[in-house]
Amino acid sequence: MCIRDRDHKAVFDGDKGPNTGGMGAYSPAPVLSEEMEREVQEKVIKPILRGMAEEGMPFKGILYAGLMITEEGPKVLEFNVRFGDPEAQAILRRLEDDLVDVALSAIDGRLVGELHWRPETSICVVLASKGYPGKYEKGKVITGIEEAEKVPTVVVFHAGTAVKDGKLVTNGGRVLNVTALGKDIVEARERVYEAVKRIQFDGMHYRTDIGLKAVKRLKG
């Protein structure tokens, strides 16, 4: 089954600056309509799976299709046989089933029926080191994660972190992934950015417009 999400590749607000591994994501993504989703299933996903099966290599696992929505419809940018990052952080916050059971069922060929998903909207905002995706410094002390996770539904996932002299410090370009759930994208954004404000490290950078296009679409 297809689960829709939207990534934000550019490092700065407004999709400006160089591309990164991803500065944030949200799910579901209203930019992909139900009609477009059916088109993706019929013209992209099913032919790939059918072709692999016909060649004696039936696919089992996670198939990530990176798409661009154009005036001519969805166009494929890339395929990955893994979750996207930070797409996974947003998508998996909505998964009600046990991920290990799902993965083992896929491996054994026992995965049938629909997975169960929370109805809420999920969002992930990446906190990055100054200079990313170029040269950046490491070893900056991180504070405020416990306070951030006091915001309802917020969970903070570590990426480029390490412990040095008993303190949590930065150890990569993308440092933390702050996630939240909400009844809609508006509430999810309010929660995640309230949590982001409680986290600090020297040179911390993040986009302030993750999910903003979905808010504008929601409000018409």
Each predicted region: which residue ranges?
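Generic long, charged, amphipathic alpha-helical segments
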Residues: K138-N177
